């Protein structure tokens, strides 16, 4: 899980979603998982 100020899609399988006010990227490639720093 990468924690970044700016989350971006790294491939076409990546999906940007919002869970409990936190922006996340989920993907079939585990290396592409990201979470946005800061939260609320």
From Swiss-Prot:
Residues that span the membrane, as ranges: none
Molecular-function GO term, any one: structural constituent of ribosome
Keyword Ribosomal protein: yes
Superkingdom assignment: Bacteria
PROSITE patterns reported for this sequence: RIBOSOMAL_L36
Annotated coiled-coil segments of the chain: none
GO cellular component terms, semicolon-separated: cytoplasm; ribonucleoprotein complex; ribosome
Record's signal peptide: none
InterPro entries in UniProt: Ribosomal_bL36, Ribosomal_bL36_sp
GO biological process assignments: translation
Pfam families the record matches: Ribosomal_L36 (PF00444)
Keywords recorded for this protein, A-Z: Ribonucleoprotein, Ribosomal protein
Family: Belongs to the bacterial ribosomal protein bL36 family.
Protein's recorded name: Large ribosomal subunit protein bL36
Organism this protein belongs to: Coxiella burnetii (strain RSA 493 / Nine Mile phase I)
């Amino acid at each position: 899980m990468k924690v970044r100020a700016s989350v971006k899609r790294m491939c076409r399988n990546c999906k940007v979603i919002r869970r409990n006010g936190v922006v996340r990227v989920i993907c079939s490639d585990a290396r592409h998982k990201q979470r946005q720093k800061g939260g609320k």
